[in-house]
Amino acid sequence: MTEQANNGGAASQNEQGAQFSLQRIYVRDLSFEAPKSPEIFRQEWNPSVALDLNTKQKQLESDFYEVVLTLSVTVKTGEEVAFIAEVQQAGIFLIKGLEAAAMSHTLGAFCPNILFPYAREALDSLVTRGSFPALMLAPVNFDALYAQEMARMQSAGEAPATAH
């Protein structure tokens, strides 16, 4: 009987405290271009890879946020563009009960960290369907990127963007 009462009390406290829940993960946009195919397949494969990543977030309604992670990859062999691939991997998250700094970190680092493996897999699948070797992108440290961006904004005298 005591255990049941304690469990019920803990659930009530948890409901009143911070909450985080992944609601949905989806591909928002996906594109692939191989402007020099099929000629590029006959060249020696010595690629240079340029990766750009970006995150953005917006509040959908009270306590629900959309976070979009965009990965854009341009692969060249010599001066020729072999392919350009881009994915916008998005997620809807229920987030409530966080202070402003924790909310900013959650939206700017924690959520993109959840989305990255899905975006990486989508890019690899897209690239291999274009008959190129898989990219096998290395993991990204979104906490470090977030800290760098916050330091840059602080030195520039900018206020951190919020999704509210």
From Swiss-Prot:
Gene Ontology cellular-component terms listed: cytoplasm
One annotated GO molecular function: unfolded protein binding
Gene3D superfamilies in the record: SecB-like (3.10.420.10)
Subcellular location: Cytoplasm
Keywords: Chaperone, Cytoplasm, Protein transport, Translocation, Transport
Superkingdom per UniProt: Bacteria
One GO term (biological process): protein folding
UniProt entry tagged with the keyword Transport: yes
Family designation: Belongs to the SecB family.
Subunit field text: Homotetramer, a dimer of dimers. One homotetramer interacts with 1 SecA dimer.
Stored PANTHER family: PROTEIN-EXPORT PROTEIN SECB, PTHR36918
Role according to the record: One of the proteins required for the normal export of preproteins out of the cell cytoplasm. It is a molecular chaperone that binds to a subset of precursor proteins, maintaining them in a translocation-competent state. It also specifically binds to its receptor SecA.
NCBIfam families hit by this protein: PRK05751.1-4 (NF004393), secB (TIGR00809)
Name of this chain's protein: Protein-export protein SecB
Lineage: Bacteria, Pseudomonadati, Pseudomonadota, Gammaproteobacteria, Pseudomonadales
